[in-house]
From Swiss-Prot:
Signal peptide residues on this chain, from the entry's feature table: none
Protein name: Nucleoid occlusion factor SlmA
Domain HTH tetR-type: 7-68
PANTHER family, per database record: HTH-TYPE TRANSCRIPTIONAL REGULATOR RUTR (PTHR30055), NUCLEOID OCCLUSION FACTOR SLMA (PTHR30055:SF183)
Self-association and partners: Homodimer. Interacts with FtsZ.
Any one GO biological process: cell division
Species: Vibrio parahaemolyticus serotype O3:K6 (strain RIMD 2210633)
Lineage of the organism: Bacteria, Pseudomonadati, Pseudomonadota, Gammaproteobacteria, Vibrionales
Originating gene: slmA
Coiled-coil regions listed in the entry: 110-142
UniProt keyword Cell division, yes or no: yes
Amino acid sequence: MAGSKKSNRREEILQALAQMLESAEGASRITTAKLAKQVGVSEAALYRHFPSKARMFEGLIEFIEEALMTRINRILDDEKDTLERIRMVMHLILAFSERNPGLTRILSGHALMFENERLRERINQLFERIETQLRQILRERKIREGKSFPVEERILAAQILGQVEGSLNRFVRSDFKYQPTANFDEYWALLSAQIK
C-alpha cells in the first residue's frame, strides 16, 4: 500500500509540474517552492519522491518518450505506405503537443533553458531518435514500393522534423494560441508534393 501511495504522489507531482508549465508560470522558471505549493506539500516532501528537480523533468521526458515512441512503433506496424507513415508520425507529434501544452514547453526546450544540461541532451536525443526513424521510413520506400526520392533521405527527414519542430515552437511562442494541427492537411499536401 505504501508503494502505491508513493507512486500516486510521484504522479501527482509530475502532473502538477506539467500543469504549471502549461500556465503563465511556465513561461518563467518553475521553482521547487512554487511546485510544492501547487501540490500542497513541503519542498522536503517533493525531495522524498524525487532527488532533484532535474529528476522531475526527467520523469516528464520519460513519459513523452514512451508515449511518442510507442505510438510511432504502432504506426509502423499498422501502416506500410511510406508517405502515409510519415504523415501519421508528423500528425502524432503535433497532436500530442496540442493535447499537452505544458509538455510542449519541454519538447521545444523552452522549459529547460535554465535547467540541467542533461535535460536538454535528453530532448535532443529524443528528436534524434525520431529523425532516425523518419530516415529509416524513407529509406524503406525503395524496398517496399520500388521508388526512391529525388533528394537524400537524411535531408528529407531533417526537413520533415524541422517542420514539426517549427510548429511546436510557434505553439509555445504564441502562448498556445496557434494549434500545431491547424491546417495540417494543407501543410501536408504542400510537403508531400515536394517529396513525391
